[in-house]
């Protein structure tokens, strides 16, 4: 095999690449590096799953062939499933094979021309760059660029599986939901042609929910664009349908089903507010996690969760814990501090799940959805209460700009940060524990320790994207709509001075 180039598919959270960016030979070398890493951890079993995107099939073929030839027992799900279901598959295999590694072939909410890989190691522990045993993807990168080869092994075995029914039952038990319990509830489900639509629809119907689906069929071409429900206007059709049908809840999910948005006929809610009834159910024992809860319960939040939501969380006897973006990194931090859950404003909800003696930390979109629908059934006024809070906050949603190159991106980033410095904002780039936030919080008039917000408060988060080339991401919340719109326009004006374009 020829030497791989010094570039590689590895990013901060996982691996992600455009389908024409690397040759099949390079992808095979990358998969082999992952398996060499796993073998060093004592792995003997590998689960392999995929989402619906078109590039996933060829990567799955390479992964399957490499793993079986190397002597691993492989549990393979060939049908497109969600990333949360793939984590369950790894958990299920771990019951009989504790040294299981899970490979999920996905590029999440990225455009159709992307593909990627998420990895969990024994204990269903997610890895990232410098995150996980031996540095996680940092070790895989070292192997990829090194000379070590994957040794062939005897005894390789392929077992085809369909974990959906087991995943559905596991999730219903975890959420404390019985068959038919949510009868009378009507929801709109927009799956954006991702892989999670069928399993979400099936689970909700099993619980008695009337589901009106949109873009339900998995389609890796993503005909309506990037499968990101947090993008502006992406959920407009679902919101309009809720108004016409009287549905109590709108649910949107991304390409691999680990990102959720919630709303109703009025629009889509911030995750900080939508998560509040979910967290309340968790604290009240609405999720059968099997764990006793410390007081106050630690809930991790990312820099984009708006401060007013955090003030509401504190009323629930919650200790909000700031941490940067990064799915693997967040789950590892949950493990370290014993957090009950975590919420990212991007729509990622993480749970601590304990069953059959194993605790693992992962997204489970079925559990998240079940808990919210159950809360709405028990309290029909709940959505109105959440909107009353959201009406007090201006938010931009995620603003994304694709710059001409990384150098241009970095210059634009510094220009925006200088604008906030000149506005006497507080700039924060790490947690109190010194953990890098992988971006910069810009805030003014926010005192979370005292639970106080000034009338002209704002809170923003600015960072360079880790999984896409030359992309800047910005998110803003503010206590004044006029101030929020003013800051948004100023930020867009600064971005516009540099070669590039706004993207979804």
Predicted regions: what they are:
Residues 75-83, 268-271, 323-325:
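Active-site nucleophile and cofactor-binding loops and adjacent substrate-binding regions
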Residues 213-215, 267-286, 358-371:
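Gly/Ser/Thr-rich active-site loops/lids in small-molecule metabolic enzymes
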Residues 1-70, 157-187:
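An N-terminal, well-structured beta->alpha segment
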Residues 36, 44-114, 202-263:
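N-terminal small/polar loop signature for handling phosphorylated ligands or for N-terminal nucleophile
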Residues 2-4, 115-245:
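Gly/Ser/Thr-enriched, mixed-charge loops and adjacent short helices
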Residues 99-114, 242-264, 269, 320-362:
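Glycine-rich phosphate-binding loop
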Residues 293-504:
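Phosphate-binding and adjacent anionic-ligand microenvironments
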